[in-house]
């Protein structure tokens, strides 16, 4: 189906498989943490024969399921996730052979540009589905090995950790009196990772040269950008399953340095905050850490965006902090509030042509997701005020959907408005937004009626997280 023999899966029934217990007898075997769905168990791994574990049928099958579950766009070969299984069934043996003998070559990565909030573009790299399969298999094998090395203050792209854990960790540090922060900004981190430095760090743990070579091939596979080839001299393009793990392995060197200095910090991917008790100490830390990052890790610190400040108002993962009565509290950052209102405005646009059912569904999905992420924040007053604004937007949509004067009059009467007022307002030339805020429409379409009709509210979702 494709000319080049890429990798294989493991829904494959004829491939030799080492049982996990076999590795106990390997010379020089070490133990690492195998992360299962329900618990974490210790499993020996042979640092000289790691590739065999990566391409084992059970690991490849798990990787195949993960790639299918995540779906995603096709790469430059245009193979979809649905086409992956037939290809693997036909080419599995050739793929495994090429991985074992080192002849395997990853395809070019397809460049995709995603707009950022600041108007710039985020560069993503979309590997082919077969490349994603092999990367996922590598990721599944290396993750439990490196989990034991990672700092407990690192939260991004790790099992059973997330943004909320990072925020709670920051709260605890601030509660201990570390009220000044170095808000560290790495300039284009994913695009500027030094390949040689990363390979050096990987080689300290991974002693199977075939695995190191395979990872190096992915790093240097090249990019297809608008039909033009671009060499990959540095960076770990975002978009592949392996990139998050490699970024954590690289930045774990920074974590170890900060820990050795006794500096409290939190890190989510490349978004780090280092805490100090005084502004003077924070300035010293900023300078020394910048020298370490640029001198030892060969990364670039954005000196304009890396700032020292009091914790109040600092933006981190969509939240900001403030201290009240000696305790750190969380609130939603103003930029996150503005972005949320802009999205709600889009979902309640008068001109998107959606029916009632689709609008309700879209609103509920977005509101539940947004509140679910920001539920740690103290934001009742903001949510109540935003709900008032949202209900007015909904009344505006409903009023517009009635269209004709005759329909408006009839519906106002059905909603309990007397005939005279229904006639007057039905013939009104006021704009949609003004009528939506009028006492007549608020009487006709009450908050209770909107709730009974199934429209979600921000406070309703917030109360689900905070029932008391």
Model regions: which residues?
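Non-catalytic, polymerase-adjacent accessory regions of viral genome-replication enzymes
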Residues: 1-89
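Conserved polymerase palm-domain catalytic core
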Residues: 98-113, 117, 149-313
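Extended C-terminal regions of large enzymes
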Residues: 393, 398, 402-468
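Amphipathic alpha-helical blocks
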Residues: 73, 83-108
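Right-hand nucleic-acid polymerase module
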Residues: 328, 347-408
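Nucleotide/phosphate-binding loop and acidic/charged catalytic motifs
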Residues: 138
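A conserved non-catalytic segment of reverse transcriptases
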Residues: 220, 296-368
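Conserved phosphate-binding loops in nucleotide/dinucleotide-binding enzymes
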Residues: 123-124, 128, 329-330
